[in-house]
Each structure stands twice: as structure tokens, then as C-alpha cells.
Amino acid sequence: ANIDIQTTGDMTNSGAIVARNALNIDAGGTVTNRLGDISGGNVAITAVGDVLNQSGTIRGTDVSVTSTTGSVINETLTQDVTVYGAVGSGTNTVMGATAGISATNTLNIDAAKDIISRGAELNAGQDANLVAGGDIKLTAIEQKNYSASRTYTEANGYTTIEEHTEQTTKQVGSTLNVGGNLTAK
């Protein structure tokens, strides 16, 4: 079965839109896939505004994502949370599901402005064509981790207190996997 969604305004998905064959989304505003799944045989998403894939999945045999006046942003969502330990406080980053736009065969992404993949995945089993009027950016996101401990040791009537705190930050990068030719311009 085919699915054809047309709207003069914005379209937001946070569930599952699954087509056995063709899946077409045409929006006069922004298309947002937040924590959702958009999948089918041939998937074509066109928006006048931005196309935002936020910790969601867009996948199909052939996938085409187009923003005629905006950007295509594929990003893994994060949230920093303050945690309190035995010794002070720090920040932990809660990571959402890894965002991904994937095609078994050909992946086409076309944006009037930028193509941005932030801590996310772009996959093409065959060729990938990334065309941006602005920049193409594959960037990392920060994942922070805080830990703290306090240890008490008693010996010969004395108490020794050891305190340890650690705040680490690592970069979680974006990936671009292409089985065939890559065109980026």
C-alpha cells in the first residue's frame, strides 16, 4: 500500500508512518519527525520549511528528503541533567535514540540552506547525493558524565576520608556510510 500525505502547513510525527510501497510527504511548512519512524519502499519527503529528524528514523529502499527554502537537520536529541553525588554536583547528558536517515539503495538530500547531521547517521547502501545551498555539516554532540564517591576508613582510632569526583565529556560523532558513490555539493 502507498501513503500520500499533503498539508499546506507543518507536519509532525512522533509515532510510526509505515508504507509497504511508496511514502510521500509534501508539506507547505516544516516536517518534524521527533522520536518517530517514517519508512516505506520509496520514501519522498518535501517541505517548504525545514525537515527535522530528531532522534527519529527515516528509512526506505530509496529515500529523498528535500527542503525547498530551509535546512535538513538530522539530530540526536540530548538533555543535560544536574546530578548530586556524595561530593558536590555535576552534569550527566541523557542521550535520545540515535537519529538516522537510511536508504537501502540511493539517498538524496537536497536543502536550500544547510544539511546538518548532529551526532546522527546518514546511510546509503548504494549512492548518496547531498546538495545544499549552504553548508553540509557532520558534527558531534557532547556526552557528559559525572561521578563522585566518598570513602571512610578507620584504623588505630583515626578516620580517613577520601573524596573523589570526576566530570568527563566525550564527543559522539556523526556517521556517513555510503556503499557506492558520494556526491556532496
Q: Where do the protein language model's features map onto the residues?
A:
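Binding/recognition "hotspot" determinant
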Residues: 1-185
